[in-house]
Amino acid sequence: MERIKELRDLMSQSRTREILTRTTVDHMAIIKKYTSGRQEKNPALRMKWMMAMKYPITADKRIIETIPERNEQGQTLWSKTSDAGSDRVMVSPLAVTWWNRNGPTTSTVHYPKIYKTYFEKAERLKHGTFGPVHFGNQVKIRRRVDINPGHADLSAKEAQDVIMEVVFPNEVGARILTSESQLMITKEKKEELQDCKISPLMVAYMLERELVRKTRFLPVAGGTSSVYIEVLHLTQGTCWEQLYTPGGEVRNDDVDQSLIIAARSIVRRATVSADPLASLLEMCHSTQIGGIRMVDILRQNPTEEQAVDICKAAMGLRISSSFSFGGFTFKRTSGSSVKKEEEVLTGNLQTLKIRVHEGYEEFTMVGRRATAILRKATRRLVQLIVSGRDEQSIAEAIIVAMVFSQEDCMIKAVRGDLNFINRANQRLNPMHQLLRHFQKDAKVLFQNWGIEPIDNVMGMIGILPDLTPSTEMSMRGVRISKMGVDEYSSTERVVVSIDRFLRVRDQRGNVLLSPEEVSETQGTEKLTITYSSSMMWEVNGPESVLVNTYQWIIRNWETVKIQWSQDPTMLYNKMEFEPFQSLVPKAARGQYSGFVRTLFQQMRDVLGTFDTVQIIKLLPFAAAPPKQSRMQFSSLAVNVRGSGMRILVRGNSPVFNYNRTTKRLTVLGKDAGALTEDPDEGTTGVESAVLRGFLILGKEDRRYGPALSINELSNLAKGEKANVLIGQGDVVLVMKRKRDSSILTDSQTATKRIRMAIN
């Protein structure tokens, strides 16, 4: 207060004011500070001082012809004196106002296209709804978030190539546009920006906003998708939050969300197949998300989620070095440990072999709804500081940390046997066994842990075994904090390896991820996910399997038909028929298969009995290992819609209905595609007798040379194929039969096959 009084007294003397405003600054150190280097030392002051002058702005000389000397109010707009050191003229800020009001206008058609991200943001805010403001403690944790809604996911280098190609197409320099998205964006932008007068540099900046994901490490309490982050300053402060619903979604958030759902489904499906890694790769390569190949998205999208990271690891991409346990991301912040195998006894006297981490280590644990700092020694939890949204979330974090600590009292708290299995019916590893056990019920764990009196530390309170807060006592080593623990900020990625069972390890051999860590949460994807792989047909239930199997046969009928006649075993073993087997009652699978295979063999042997529709209908049943029996069936059962439905061997049924007029197949009322051939029963024809002893495979195939006449056919060796000219100038591909026994002397017709091949 004394100082302020003294200053007030000084300021009241006119001499003081004069010294401060009039005298020159001639202290060398000060002059040096403000004049050395090109960097402006006090931009705000400089701006105020410049704008206080009459003509602070320089402009091109041509401006004098365009702008009058005075405006309507008679104020001077430009000075006749030239700018010292350049051939520009000095103009007043009023000249800018005049220009904005009366200057030349250009077409504005390109503005919404160039400033697309801004226009879209304005729309989102216009349609967004802001709710009430709540005051209270905000648990914010720093997370790496996307701050730029509405962007594509190109790498900086890819975006640079696109921008150069769009904005400066004639510049020299090697630009290789390879990815699908690069080519698509370049084409679209070139069309949009024809005759655009906006400065190329501005266009380049705006394109960068649209093409590249920008992330920042920001304190966030609520939603982390980019449409929430763009209003972060409006929705959360130090002690308040305002509820907000965005007025629109952006594709990049939808891609992130749909990618996670697709990756989870794929990992879950791969786990139960014979070769999980090969299956996972096959599915990633054949899946599209919102029309873009999933593998392209994985290469570009930095989303860190367990299933997504497993898919990336399988593709040989680098991922974050943090590891996952119990749905929490662990990052070691200090200390080290060595791993040793140890046998321990549970409270039920069951022996578990666990890999014990020996040594003192500190970790941060970050989950969706809780975060923690964990300090542990060998099989001992030293300290755990947790913060979370609610009691449930805090409990989850405590359970995971207690199991991770490998303490003896945790293992002794196990009641009953541990026999949890994964989706593929394999036993989980011991650490996940323990985790599942206590996630089901942690009462005994918390009761046995022990409690201790606590010191009064600012911002920390204790938590009792029944999860009530306390300022006097707490579970041993466990404290609740008001402050969140920040997510690991580094974007460093490491090389990892993945084994056949989808366990991901770093180069030291530490397991970072495994399928057990993949969340079971099912969401509804925002973008359409198209799983082309037959392994994913069952994701949407039995009906989807049925429809997809028949659609696949129809789509590939040309090749299926040839395999059916030449190499049926290979056809029956196709993985596309695997999902179908789960629909066939277990007891009947082998018998159905034997029956259908016998039927097919008769069709191959007896000319004129080939029936396209019947082959398509029964083919999936032939894929199971066959049982030899003399049983005949008039219908075959499939388990869909919660009960057994039947497919008629001859004729239509609600499950499989072929309309001969429209040539379309409906499966369970859903359209399964059209047959391009005419599978009608054929009438007798001239060619029948001549073509006995030959198998008609299909349409002409040029690889087998020019069409032979019917007379030339006799020269073919058994098993040899040739194109042959029949009837009214039609050409079909035939093969001379390998077995004479199958040549029937009666003239049962081959017409049916001929007609099928021609139409």
Curated annotation (Swiss-Prot):
InterPro entries: Flu_PB2_2nd, Flu_PB2_6th, Flu_PB2_C, Flu_PB2_CAP-bd, Flu_PB2_middle, Flu_PB2_N, INV_PB2, PB2_helical. Keywords: Cap snatching, Eukaryotic host gene expression shutoff by virus, Eukaryotic host transcription shutoff by virus, Host gene expression shutoff by virus, Host mitochondrion, Host nucleus, Host-virus interaction, Inhibition of host innate immune response by virus, Inhibition of host MAVS by virus, Inhibition of host RLR pathway by virus, Inhibition of host RNA polymerase II by virus, mRNA capping, mRNA processing, Viral immunoevasion, Viral transcription, Virion. Coiled coil: none annotated. Pfam families: Flu_PB2_1st, Flu_PB2_2nd, Flu_PB2_3rd, Flu_PB2_4th, Flu_PB2_5th, Flu_PB2_6th, Flu_PB2_7th. Belongs to the influenza viruses PB2 family. Plays an essential role in transcription initiation and cap-stealing mechanism, in which cellular capped pre-mRNAs are used to generate primers for viral transcription. Recognizes and binds the 7-methylguanosine-containing cap of the target pre-RNA which is subsequently cleaved after 10-13 nucleotides by the viral protein PA. Plays a role in the initiation of the viral genome replication and modulates the activity of the ribonucleoprotein (RNP) complex. Influenza RNA polymerase is composed of three subunits: PB1, PB2 and PA. Interacts (via N-terminus) with PB1 (via C-terminus). Interacts with nucleoprotein NP (via N-terminus). Interacts (via N-terminus) with host MAVS (via N-terminus); this interaction inhibits host innate immune response. This is Polymerase basic protein 2. The lineage of its organism: Viruses, Riboviria, Orthornavirae, Negarnaviricota, Polyploviricotina.
